Amino acid sequence: MTQDEKRIGTRMAYVNGIAILANFAIIALLIGPDAVGYDTTYGAMTDILQFVAGFSAACVVLVAGKVWDWENNFYFGLMSRIVFVVACIQMLYGVAATATANSVFDSTFNASEIQAMGGATTWFQFVAFGLYGLSLLSVDDGKLPGWGRSVGYGFVVLVLGAQLGSLFGLVPATLFVPIFVLGGVILYPAFIISVGNTISKS
């Protein structure tokens, strides 16, 4: 691993965590959690943050793959490649709604419909990141700090449990929201930052 890769992986881990937190803050505090459809006031901001989150996640996955030797750890290598594709899909849909809303050309779908298409992939994205975290933790040989492993397992258990339960309608909305906040907005950014810290010391 080159020094440039180490620097990029470390910085992008922080960028990813910050983008996730900033996006949630805008949605929760400015747009409102009950809002439906593309928001013409803040939609561009959340779309750009989603694009940044996808790009930074792709960078972290590639560098982390070298740190945890994805070529010799099959399931970790597999999930790394799957999550890289998921991150690309995040980028693909990241600014699509805003681009559609501001397009000078006629479109078959409006911005809200484009946003809904991207949202339809969210369930699998969470599952993919959860399985990626689990595969990384399974091959970690002491590189991650103790707190990083703790928040990592917390994230994995919450996100996979919640997504599996929601698939069959077993998680009520009143419970899903706090699980989402704890797992996706607190534990995930902390875990990805711990990965960045490990990259910087490798």
What is each PLM-predicted segment?
Residues 1-202:
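Hydrophobic, aromatic-enriched alpha-helical segments typical of multi-pass transmembrane helices
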